[in-house]
Amino acid sequence: MIIENSKVYNLDEVENLFFRPAFCGKAAEDMGIRVLYNMPLPTKIPLFSHNNDLLKPFTSGWQGGAAKSLEQKEIPMVKLKAESSYSAEDYFSTIYEIITNSSEVSLGDLSGTDLEKAETELFRRSLAESIYTNTWFGDEDGLLSNVSCMTGFLRQFITSKEDEDSITLLVHQEEQELPVSDIFKSAWTNANDELRALASEGNLVFFVNTRIYDAYHFYLESLGLIDMNGSGVNGRPTLNYHGIPIIEIPANGLRLNYAKDFCVLTDRRNLVLALNTTDSPEKEIRMWYNPDEMENRQRVVFLIGAAIVDPMLLSGHIYNQGVSLI
């Protein structure tokens, strides 16, 4: 099976078919972070200073003081491309599986539209997974992992602690041994007042790796605090600590050189992923068949960046050599 007619997607199709379904709305909420899409370049996050003393005795004239200062943090953007290729035989088996899993497709009449939808779904899955991996585990220096297209959140956590020691995020160089419940407890109790005060807004979240997530799951199960029939989907329950959601960050088989276990408490609005598909001259998403190599090929070019808005709103633990959970 080959892509007989190459397909180049226009701007609206790029947004509506590839990026918005994977990184906007419910999808962004599930990721637990803030996503900015197609913001003007350079991409900046406005940070307004706060004035908690707004009320004044009434008199004529203006008593509001000077205008509030506007601070902006720029998100460094990098241009990336994602490419994949399949032999005609492999491409057929992959696409055919996607098609047959759809109840709306008549296998006796596979139209071009059905095939195109399947091709789009295949590429979108791969693209979303690759962006997710780079967003969390990327390191341009290549020290954390072999994913080096951009510097992701985990590497930025460690760099922020190195730059500002007063951040209540502890980076442990040696292997630790402690109960999993103590990890969450200390992340909360050690958090500064500014971070704890944000709990009332409902946006605090714990980001943990799969190993800590599983250990906490089994810990709650041993206490009889998890209803395995009603609180999870496919064996993955929705966990929380004192009402704060716990989001699992799987490495998807990626081997990390350090930061092998982590538990980070922050506000979900504090971690920003910026995506831009409009302001790069080489922007494109296309699919085509290469007759010389007999391959179906797919490519996307876009801009991406990840940033921590306020490193002081971080708390928790990063274990470079892992943690022995008891």
Show the residue positions of the predicted features.
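Short coil/turn segments at secondary-structure boundaries
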Residues: 96, 135-141, 200-209
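Sequence/fold signature of self-assembling virion shell proteins
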Residues: 2-53, 150-182, 213-326
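Extended, non-catalytic structural segments that build the interaction scaffolds
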Residues: 55, 59, 107-110, 266, ...
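C-terminal interaction module
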Residues: 183-219
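Alpha-helical scaffold segments that mediate packing/assembly in large oligomeric complexes
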Residues: 103-190, 325-326
